Amino acid sequence: MTAIVDIIGREILDSRGNPTVEVDVALEDGAMGRAAVPSGASTGAHEAVELRDDDQTRYFGKGVRKAVDAINGEIFDAIGGMDAEQQAQIDEILIGLDGTANKSRLGANAILGVSLALARAAADSLDMPLYRYVGGVSARTLPVPMMNIVNGGVHADNPIDFQEFMIMPVGAKTFSEGLRCGSEIFHTLRAELKKAGHNTNVGDEGGFAPNLPSASAALDFIMGAIVKAGYKPGDDVALALDPAASEFFKDGKYVYAGEGKTRSIEEQARYLAKLASDYPIVSIEDGMAEDDFEGWKLLTDLIGKSCQLVGDDLFVTNVTRLADGIGKGLANSILIKVNQIGTLTETLAAVEMAYKAGYTAVMSHRSGETEDSTIADLAVATNCGQIKTGSLSRSDRAAKYNQLLRIEQQLGAQARYGGRAALKALA
């Protein structure tokens, strides 16, 4: 039987040393599932609420005992004894139990931990890998990684205004080959930065955080490292950006503190379009601020047919905001972060809506991560073809890459690599 017999919540630490939630779900047949919840540094205003204790005597107010108490008490009381395979029904109960639009009463961190641990427990009971349990027989596409090798913005203590500069091994034949490519470029970039006198400290997501003056300077270093490592920019390896523009959008303008420049909405869109023409940039995430719909429309009209434009803060994995954006013709892709919405069922619904509208989907980590590798399985389960899970250092990031290597090995000849076709802009 897959009846839920126990749910145990606990407070653990994430990759930034902040508390987060971990949940164990035990079933009657002895099966068990465990999930840990990530957290973000640059968070969208419309995300589901991560419940913190606000007790300044513990972890500077960042403790999650309230969320843990909700898991061990109210949530277990509501779903204990239910069949773990009834994922959608249980997720609906959890949403109703919270009773708020943004999961602020029980906390999205509490609800998500239970939702994901539940899926893992059910998969364990059926002796199935998570990607197969969630995705069925068609789950076999290994994603192209977006490897964040230079960090800026709120992810690093340097002057670079953009948050992430990523490489995508679109020309690789397999995931493992793509991972090797990324690793070789990462180590080459380290050597090149060091040779030029820059520090090689890493940011929250494992990328380097050098004191470079502009986005172009960072892109030039990355282009050089790609060539030096023996790869061809644009053919073997494409570039992707995450400006996280909401972080520097002030009073209707984009304020580049590091560069000492201010750009209007139109200037911001045209600046990004120029970068995309000057470099082999195939994906830009959050190039405009989350509520700058005018800017998003302008950017989409400018380069939406040739570049993947990913909405993260714009959509926050929320079907209501996604439907609104689709209707307005904003972006052409959605970033999928499970903790932005708070249940597995709602996450899968967002992916499905994106696909139906002809949008791509990118499975994503958060800057505050754990060793939990659920998103690797979800990337394969949804066949989304793209994953964003950090750089080639820090074990919290490598955990996801290593899980994808295992999945590729398990799938054997069935495995397919997303490659160039994963991005509609390149297909």
From Swiss-Prot:
GO terms for biological process? glycolytic process
Identify the InterPro entries for this entry: Enolase, Enolase-like_C_sf, Enolase-like_N, Enolase_C, Enolase_CS, Enolase_N
Pathway info: Carbohydrate degradation; glycolysis; pyruvate from D-glyceraldehyde 3-phosphate: step 4/5
Q: Where is the active site?
A: 205, 337
Q: Name the EC number(s).
A: 4.2.1.11
Q: Where does the record say this protein resides?
A: Cytoplasm; Secreted; Cell surface
Q: Catalyses which reaction?
A: (2R)-2-phosphoglycerate = phosphoenolpyruvate + H2O
UniProt GO molecular function: magnesium ion binding; phosphopyruvate hydratase activity
Q: What residues bind Mg(2+), as annotated? A: 242, 285, 312
GO CC aspect terms:
cell surface; extracellular region; phosphopyruvate hydratase complex
As to how many cofactors bind and how, the note says: Binds a second Mg(2+) ion via substrate during catalysis.
What class does this enzyme belong to in the EC scheme? lyase
List cofactor names only: Mg(2+)
Matching entries from Pfam families are given as: Enolase_C (PF00113), Enolase_N (PF03952)
Q: What is its main location?
A: cytoplasm
Q: Tell me the protein family, please.
A: Belongs to the enolase family.
Question: What is the protein's given name?
Answer: Enolase
The species is: Nitrobacter hamburgensis (strain DSM 10229 / NCIMB 13809 / X14)
